Regions:
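Fold-independent oxyanion-binding glycine-rich loops
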Residues: 18, 46-47, 56, 75-76, ...
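N-terminal phosphate/diphosphate-binding loop that engages ATP/GTP or pyrophosphate donors
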Residues: 4, 29-91
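Short coil/turn connectors at secondary-structure junctions
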Residues: 8-10, 37-39, 67-69, 101-103, ...
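Phosphate-binding/switch loop-helix module in NTP-utilizing enzymes
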Residues: 83-113
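Extreme N-terminal, non-catalytic leader segments
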Residues: 1-16, 20
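Phosphate/Mg2+-binding loops and adjacent switch elements
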Residues: 105-151
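Conserved lysine of the Walker
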Residues: 23
């Protein structure tokens, strides 16, 4: 699937599954291999909980703690944009993709009920309901065991 990013259309493909199914491991392996092949890859990770990317005592943390609604930290080698949502609804995947720069592919971790094409990741020691079969956007299952046929 292609979505509109800052520089035009970008390919989007997801990796979905329940907690501890191996999503991050698969994403990291895919990013490593695709970048080795010369692709420019971005990722978006969905978190079900609050998180911080800066740390107590750092200037950016102090800016946010003082009430800044948005903070950008920039250096010669990278920049990060932190937006406090407060009472705003969570950002949609399409909205976040709109912030992505020129890339060959964006891999999305999470958003297991989105409309973008995805792989489902399953692990034998992390049993969970199957997503595939109930969601046409799931194109394949990656698992450490053979999967029984659905009845």
């Amino acid at each position: 699937m292609q979505r509109l990013g800052e520089e035009g259309l970008i390919r989007v493909f997801g990796v979905a599954g329940y907690k501890n199914s191996g999503k991050t491991t698969l994403i990291v392996d895919l990013v490593r291999e695709l970048t080795r092949r010369g692709w420019r890859v971005g990722t978006i990770k969905h978190a079900h909980h609050s998180f911080d990317i800066d740390h107590p005592g750092k200037d950016s943390y102090l800016h946010r703690a003082a009430g800044a609604a948005e903070v950008i930290v920039a250096s010669a080698s990278r920049w990060a944009h932190i937006r406090e949502l407060a009472d705003e609804p969570p950002a949609s995947l399409d909205e976040l993709l709109g912030h992505m720069g020129p890339l060959d592919l964006v891999l999305v971790e999470g958003w297991k009920h989105g409309t973008h094409p995805r792989l489902e990741v399953r692990r034998s020691d992390a049993p969970a309901p199957r997503l595939a079969g109930h969601d046409a956007a799931i194109l394949a299952i990656v698992s450490d065991l053979p999967l029984p046929e659905e009845s």
